[in-house]
């Protein structure tokens, strides 16, 4: 009887250990996936900025879903969104063409991930330099991006972006 009890206890203990191990492995896999997703989302935002600095709009469009939306808020007023890669790409190219120097410095990012959808807030300081009316002008802006991302075929893409220009300063650069 004692042997039966010990055998039964051993089987229950082993089963419990196996279940605990499976739970820990599953939890660890989810945590690793979340870390990978967070790194991928930060890389997505930084790559967007790097490509903007180089005026590589075609490559930037690869970071968006086909039906993406991008809108801008300036002075508290939201402009109508650009919808679709073609409209977004044209708007970006036209705007960046105004400047010979484009510089983005990204800061903090927070994201909430829910499966293959994520929402994020990113901060960026943008410096744009161009010639206007014969003067070398520098625009410096603090931008807060409110993004919605989707993971498609294992790759995170921007589905929606609202660029809120929280402040903006324009000054003439003296030579």
What are these regions (language model features)?
Residues 21-33, 96-175:
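A beta-strand edge to alpha-helix "cap/lid" segment located at domain peripheries
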């Amino acid at each position: 009887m004692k042997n039966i009890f010990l055998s039964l206890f051993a089987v229950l203990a082993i089963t419990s250990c196996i279940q605990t191990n499976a739970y820990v492995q599953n939890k660890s896999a989810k945590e690793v996936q979340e870390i990978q997703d967070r790194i991928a989302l930060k890389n997505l935002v930084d790559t967007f900025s790097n490509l903007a600095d180089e005026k590589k709009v075609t490559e930037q469009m690869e970071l968006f879903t086909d039906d993406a939306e991008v809108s801008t808020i300036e002075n508290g007023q939201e402009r109508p969104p650009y919808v679709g890669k073609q409209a977004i790409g044209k708007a970006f190219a036209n705007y960046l063409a105004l400047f010979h120097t484009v510089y983005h410095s990204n800061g903090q990012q927070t994201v909430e991930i829910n499966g293959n959808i994520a929402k994020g807030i990113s901060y960026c300081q943008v410096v744009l330099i161009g010639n206007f009316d014969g003067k070398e002008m520098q625009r410096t802006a603090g931008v807060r991006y409110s993004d919605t991302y989707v993971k498609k075929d294992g790759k995170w893409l921007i589905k929606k972006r609202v660029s809120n220009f929280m402040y903006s300063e324009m000054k003439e650069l003296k030579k």
